[in-house]
């Protein structure tokens, strides 16, 4: 019986060829990804040389690719310290933004709430006189499906929130009514 755990020389050769082809494909891919840049660099240099020869310029500088400078250990140490300082600054900025963001959202929520209350008041105040009387209240309640509500009941509802006893609810009283109903 043959031991299947041993690799035959043919299978080893197949693996080596496969790895060689894979390596070649990676080299070609690296070259092809940088090819457009090299193509552009070659033709831009050729154009610069051609125009300098045509214009009789002697010292023409060609664009070159700069080499990457690897920092020494002292530079790395400094940059690590700088990174720590940046992280500390960013944490402080984050905390500040969170606090200001919460305040902004609360203010925005209050503003939106006020706009919603104004719009609700406008819906109740059909004749736009700045007051909600018992007739307007009855009409809106009937639109909302409360048809069984009588004029007398509407008058009682208005009377509960009518602080100045004029028989109508003004915007200030309406805001208080809304605040009481949500608290």
From Swiss-Prot:
The keyword Amino-acid biosynthesis does not apply. Coiled coil: none annotated. The keyword Nucleus does not apply. It comes from the Eukaryota. InterPro entries: EF-hand-dom_pair, EF_Hand_1_Ca_BS, EF_hand_dom, EF_hand_pair_protein_CML-like. Residues 112-147, 149-183 form the EF-hand domain. Keywords: Calcium, Metal-binding, Repeat. SMART domains: EFh (SM00054). Ca(2+) 2 binds at residues 162, 164, 166, 168, 173. One of its GO terms (molecular function) is calcium ion binding. Potential calcium sensor. This is Probable calcium-binding protein CML47. It comes from Arabidopsis thaliana. The lineage of its organism: Eukaryota, Viridiplantae, Streptophyta, Embryophyta, Tracheophyta. The gene is CML47.
């Amino acid at each position: 019986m043959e031991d299947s755990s041993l690799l035959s020389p043919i299978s080893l050769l197949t693996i080596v060829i496969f790895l060689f082809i894979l390596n070649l494909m990676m080299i070609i891919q690296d070259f092809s990804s940088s090819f457009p840049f090299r193509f552009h660099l070659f033709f831009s240099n050729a154009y610069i040389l051609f125009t300098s020869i045509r214009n009789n310029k002697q010292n023409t500088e060609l664009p070159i690719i700069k080499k990457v400078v690897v920092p020494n250990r002292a530079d790395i140490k400094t940059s690590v310290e700088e990174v720590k300082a940046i992280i500390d600054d960013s944490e402080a900025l984050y905390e500040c933004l969170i606090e200001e963001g919460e305040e902004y959202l609360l203010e925005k929520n209050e503003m939106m709430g006020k706009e919603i209350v104004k719009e609700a008041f406008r819906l109740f105040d059909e004749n736009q006189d700045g007051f909600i009387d018992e007739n307007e209240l009855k009409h809106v309640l009937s639109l909302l499906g409360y048809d069984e509500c009588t004029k007398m009941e509407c008058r009682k509802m208005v009377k509960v929130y009518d602080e100045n006893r004029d028989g109508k609810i003004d915007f200030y009283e309406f805001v208080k009514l809304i605040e009481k109903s949500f608290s």
